[in-house]
Amino acid sequence: MEGPTHPKPSKDKTFSWDLMILVGVLLRLDVGMANPSPHQIYNVTWTITNLVTGTKANATSMLGTLTDAFPTMYFDLCDIIGNTWNPSDQEPFPGYGCDQPMRRWQQRNTPFYVCPGHANRKQCGGPQDGFCAVWGCETTGETYWRPTSSWDYITVKKGVTQGIYQCSGGGWCGPCYDKAVHSSITGASEGGRCNPLILQFTQKGRQTSWDGPKSWGLRLYRSGYDPIALFSVSRQVMTITLPQAMGPNLVLPDQKPPSRQSQIESRVTPHHSQGNGGTPGITLVNASIAPLSTPVTPASPKRIGTGNRLINLVQGTYLALNVTNPNKTKDCWLCLVSRPPYYEGIAVLGNYSNQTNPPPSCLSDPQHKLTISEVSGQGSCIGTVPKTHQALCKKTQKGHKGTHYLAAPSGTYWACNTGLTPCISMAVLNWTSDFCVLIELWPRVTYHQPEYVYTHFDKTVRLRREPISLTVALMLGGLTVGGIAAGVGTGTKALLETAQFGQLQMAMHTDIQALEESISALEKSLTSLSEVVLQNRRGLDILFLQEGGLCAALKEECCFYADHTGLVRDNMAKLRERLKQRQQLFDSQQGWFEGWFNKSPWFTTLISSIMGPLLILLLILLFGPCILNRLVQFVKDRISVVQALILTQQYQQIKQYDPDQP
């Protein structure tokens, strides 16, 4: 750009050469980055640094990709100036600076311009010139000629601070006063910051590489010498802490996804015709798998099918998401992941209860060793947490003395290295090296924008963008400890949120119950197989009786089958009993008002339909007589006035005179 013709000589723009070394060092600081996927989410931190003092003027962190994590940054002009603009012997009253409220106020009304140092233009000079040795180097700022640029990375403009800026007369400068020093001044701000600036990234800045810090120079536009301030903008990219496994099974985190069988397509019978396409990693919940073994006898109770259980999980997730964030559910796809893990835990902060006796939740929920292979976030931890899992802890408590129980809030669990449990015993925790993290348990459901599925059916040849998979657990994390699951709050919204979350909890409970039945069926199959093997073994021993039995005939060591299914059967019986107790506890926690809506599905529709007319009728009955009386009284008053006017028109006023006057 070509700058205007200014009557200011370029020789006035001088600065200390010592800053060139500092800027040269900062420009060579590189952040080592690999070549990751462009859709990977990072924790991005942007920092504005005063190059003279090395202090940070602003540090903003956000989650996003390397192409969209560009926030708007706010800072004060004095944060990048420090004490470099304080008056000197040559200019005792400069009209700018940050050491006094009056100078800060005068500085606020002075224009400024910014010149980039990353352009490496020789005519613009170096740090001693603020990269503005000649006119035309400025790319942004707040002056009357409004400098702009199509290639620079940032724009810097003045911000707005509310307050009183009348510094004449009584000397009230409002926010230019530091409230820590002048607490009695009306409108005093933190540190006397009354020169706010707004930094935004341009389109060119969003496309450039931020491998190292980039510097700029800011100068005031005034008569005489233009003071210089140097600052840099840098980006720090950190990977988000990966989820870690919690539980005794250390094999789950390293397990591979299940292999795809070629015959599986012939065993899928679609219930509804919804297209022939499919997406890897997504479970088709509208399909049923043909049984591979003997079907269940008619005498056995009818259980909900696999397809219905999966649909209930997705439907419960949708209802919970629709209540908490309805804008996200206007047009989206919720996909149930078909590969393990099927559930994930989100570490949360919560107020767990400390009880001397075991609460009902400790008795009704299953206490088997269930491993959660993915736990992410940061929450409350208790016990001696190893260094490998300290990233999951935002608040750590070593333990409690005594023999009492810590019950997790409703809808949450303790994920311990010995398994998942709703409550923990401090006696066991103090005796062992166990540690636990408070988590929320969510089904593994991913959230996608509508374009995600459309791209799979698009037959045109184009490069498809890799979608950003966002699990619903990250979107609903903190829902239970926020009070919805516990029913905290009053009104229709609180009851609705509690009901929707309860439906999701019931769907997960049904899925876990189906898992128990699958394990029981596997145990029965194993027992039946062992009986067949033992029967064949006895038959072969009879055939080789003369040789001394089968083992002697084979000249091998004799092997005997040890059946451990009895222990499995006992554990499954206990699990069924606890599931039954949990169902009873779940039913007992529902209030009488919630029971109305659960007993009859049409009751909710009936209430919502007749509630409006009933309220209108009630208002008419309450306020109708009063309004009618007021209306009748008003009509009577108007009629009385009209009657009085008619009567006065029939008579004439008699003239009065004084008889004493002639």
UniProtKB/Swiss-Prot annotation:
GO CC, any one term: virion membrane
Single biological process term from Gene Ontology: fusion of virus membrane with host plasma membrane
Subunit structure and binding partners: The mature envelope protein (Env) consists of a trimer of SU-TM heterodimers attached by a labile interchain disulfide bond.
Organism: Feline leukemia virus (strain B/lambda-B1)
Disulfide bonds: C115-C132, C124-C137, C332-C335, C332-C559, C551-C558
Role noted for this protein: The surface protein (SU) attaches the virus to the host cell by binding to its receptor. This interaction triggers the refolding of the transmembrane protein (TM) and is thought to activate its fusogenic potential by unmasking its fusion peptide. Fusion occurs at the host cell plasma membrane.
Residue span of region Fusion peptide: 468-488
The name this protein goes by in its record: Envelope glycoprotein
Record lipid sites (S-palmitoyl cysteine): C626
Post-translational modification: Specific enzymatic cleavages in vivo yield mature proteins. Envelope glycoproteins are synthesized as an inactive precursor that is N-glycosylated and processed likely by host cell furin or by a furin-like protease in the Golgi to yield the mature SU and TM proteins. The cleavage site between SU and TM requires the minimal sequence [KR]-X-[KR]-R. The R-peptide is released from the C-terminus of the cytoplasmic tail of the TM protein upon particle formation as a result of proteolytic cleavage by the viral protease. Cleavage of this peptide is required for TM to become fusogenic.
Signal peptide: 1-34
Positions bearing the site annotation: Cleavage: R465, E466, L645, I646
Region (Immunosuppression): 534-550
Region (Disordered): 251-281
Motif (CXXC): 332-335
Keywords attached to this entry: Cleavage on pair of basic residues, Coiled coil, Disulfide bond, Fusion of virus membrane with host cell membrane, Fusion of virus membrane with host membrane, Glycoprotein, Host cell membrane, Host membrane, Host-virus interaction, Lipoprotein, Membrane, Palmitate, Signal, Transmembrane, Transmembrane helix, Viral attachment to host cell, Viral envelope protein, Viral penetration into host cytoplasm, Virion, Virus entry into host cell
Cytoplasmic topological domain residue ranges: 628-662
Residues spanned by motif CX6CC: 551-559
Coiled-coil intervals: 496-545, 555-591
Domain remark in the UniProt entry: The 17 amino acids long immunosuppressive region is present in many retroviral envelope proteins. Synthetic peptides derived from this relatively conserved sequence inhibit immune function in vitro and in vivo.
Stretches of the chain found on the membrane's Extracellular side: 35-606
